[in-house]
Amino acid sequence: MAEFDLCALFSSLKVGDVSSSDELKKHIQSASKERTPLTEPGEGQSMDIDEEGGRQDPGILYLYVDCPTMMRCFYGGSLPYNSRHGALITNLPPYQKDVSLGEVCRGLRQASGFFGYEDVIRSAYFAALSVPGYFVKLDGQMELTSTKGKSLTFDLYASNQLRLEPGALVRHGECKFGME
């Protein structure tokens, strides 16, 4: 794909003019319904298997990085190595109302062992990905404390296959954590 085409695609997938958690949620859900996966799991790729032996598609998963890192990843066709497991993503949506950005940063740092999450800027930007078959669900989960003191748990997924297909990126933009 030509560089201009990649630039246009990256720009068209950016979530803009969204000021609340609810607006971001609606935008991502709409994009999720409209998308047509451009890649299918191939032979030799990791897949989640549920208790009855069928493949699970976790749907949209989220990568938290800063915007320049996301741009480099997209244009370079690769995911960042942001944990000891390779690329780490989660089902924590970037519009979660009852959790602060600082708490998300703490949870990502603890889950990944990655020093980059010391700075909240590292988790203030998201990429919503549709990557069936590329990621394996980890045994551990990310545990966060809500703004009301409740325990929240989110699944973690990882892959050491760091190739990123342009069709895997559903949307990207600024997180709207803690915005009620």
UniProtKB/Swiss-Prot annotation:
Keywords associated with the record: Cytokinin biosynthesis, Glycosidase, Hydrolase, Plasmid
Protein name: Cytokinin-beta-glucosidase
GO biological process, one term: carbohydrate metabolic process
Gene it is expressed from: rolC
Catalytic class of the enzyme: hydrolase
Location of region: Disordered: 26-54
Comp. bias (Basic and acidic residues): 26-37
Function: Hydrolyzes cytokinin glucosides thus liberating free cytokinins. Contributes to the root inducing activity.
Organism expressing this protein natively: Rhizobium rhizogenes
Keyword Chloroplast found: no
GO molecular function: beta-glucosidase activity
EC number: 3.2.1.-
